[in-house]
Amino acid sequence: MAGLSGVPIIILKEGSKRESGKDAQRKNILAAKAVAESIRTTLGPKGMDKMLIAGEEATITNDGATILREMDIEHPVAKMIVEVAKAQDDEIGDGTTTAVIIAGKLLEKAEGLLDQDVHPTVIVQGYKQAAARAQKVLSEMAVDVSADEATLSKIARTAMLGKGIEMAMDKLAALSVEAAQAIAGFEGKDIEENIKTVMIPGGRIDDSSIIYGIVLEKERTSLEMPRKIENAKIMLLEGTLEIKKLDTDAKVTITEAKNLSSFKEGEENVIKSQVDAIAAAGANVVFCEKGIGVTAQNYLARQGMLGVRRVSREDMKMLALATGARLVGDVMAVTAKDLGSAALVEERKVGKEKKMLFIEGCPQAKAVTIVLHGVSEQVLEEMERALDDSLNVVLDVIRSRKIVPGGGAPEMIVAENLRQYASTLEGREQLAVRAFADAVESIPLTLAENSGFDPLDSLAALRAKTGQGKAFGLDMATGQPSDMLAAGIVEPLKVKTQAIKSATEAATMVLRVDDVIAAKREELAPKPGQSPHDYTMPQMPMPHY
């Protein structure tokens, strides 16, 4: 046994690469910082846009969630940071850029602490203490508000600042407030999904409107059917209105012409009885999830009904929410109680050739549609992203009734409080708490830099004003401190608390990793000039700017 001393024991396959300790932590931190840096310049009302190129398609946006979603990221730690943005977007719908910037800055500050031989566990503990304190400070500074139209409009406008749609901000803010108020009273975890957005190129932005119902990119199944139905009674059929084909290889042999006629007549009678059952229930509009055969189309047209086939499952559910109809599986069992209602169902020509179906005037609509008009598809896509952000924050304020000032004011107050809190701590955790304060303060610093002001001068001015009884944030026009509440620059409390939570979770998760083992893979084969055993981790492709 003694003879084996000093002999290395190999447990990994040849070609595997292992990095541990500070080397692993530094590389992981570098990857996280690269992600944060890629979207840092998009923060704020004067943030820059990014051009994302995929093949022949280009997307121009400064929406953090969109940028990170479109980036082709391979590094596992970088992917973890992207998950921060996804969690923020899924939970709140806004604040993704803030969360990622704070996460990147927390890791940058942690790197400095690691160089001072502060143990990662101590840093993690300090960050957790600071995050808990920050949540408390944010909650204490929150302002209770009523969900009146003026307040909600301020929230909506703040969420859309810097999205490149300033010319449409007033209209979009009004649409988001109206849509949110229309569905806010209904129960459901993801109630925002009850709002559908339809984009129509052409026309003026002011032509955009809300339909208390649903708009489908569909048209009537037959031109013989009426184009317009008033006082519509709507049936939603999960099945089909056509003769089903047999699943087996069975064949029917007909030897006489009269038998063929009888066979076809029998098929038609089946369809006729189904259409008669629909008519008897009182329906005059039928939406079918599957097909509507030619025979059924003819019978529906004779009855003066409008039929639409191959409606997606998602649209069927939205129709049910909007019209109050129930999804019916057996057409022969339909009753008047299964039907929904709408003041109007109409096929309309949109643009030069496209047609859409408008189901509007639903008396108790639990789903609404926002119809956006714009000069181009790119403008419409950016309008939709801005509208999505504003809808989410408006709905959050309607639920929580709590807001905080914007312009970096909450971060300044949190940073000052954390520095005071750090002075009460005795261990090395105080270093981590101070680092956390610096990381949070990077938000107003970045806002100033992106607005073209000297970030250090702006930060110094904000620090001098913070704690004087008002919520001073950065005035993006002057670079000087300004009362954000008085200026109407406000955000939902939950956007800020979730950003702190998401960023802290991501940073602490990265700091806990002290060993990276990468197995040999074909795609990691050495490149020209690279050592055969230098299997470095994949680089993170960045988007084209």
Question: Model regions: which residues?
Answer:
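Extended, low-charge hydrophobic alpha-helical regions
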Residues: 26, 72-74, 367-371, 375-545
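Glycine/serine-rich anion-binding loops at beta->alpha junctions
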Residues: 19, 88-98, 403-405
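Active-site cofactor/substrate anionic-group-binding motifs, chiefly glycine-
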Residues: 57-91
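Residue-level signature of catalytic and energy-coupling elements of molecular machines
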Residues: 44, 93, 117, 176, ...
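Hydrophobic or amphipathic alpha-helical targeting/insertion segments
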Residues: 106-150
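Alpha-helical transmembrane segments of multi-pass membrane proteins, especially transporters
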Residues: 96, 100-104, 120-128, 430-438, ...
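Short hydrophobic alpha-helical segments that form membrane-spanning helices or hydrophobic packing faces
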Residues: 51-54, 99-103, 412-417, 495-496
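Extended amphipathic alpha-helical scaffolds
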Residues: 2-65, 71, 131-371, 375, ...
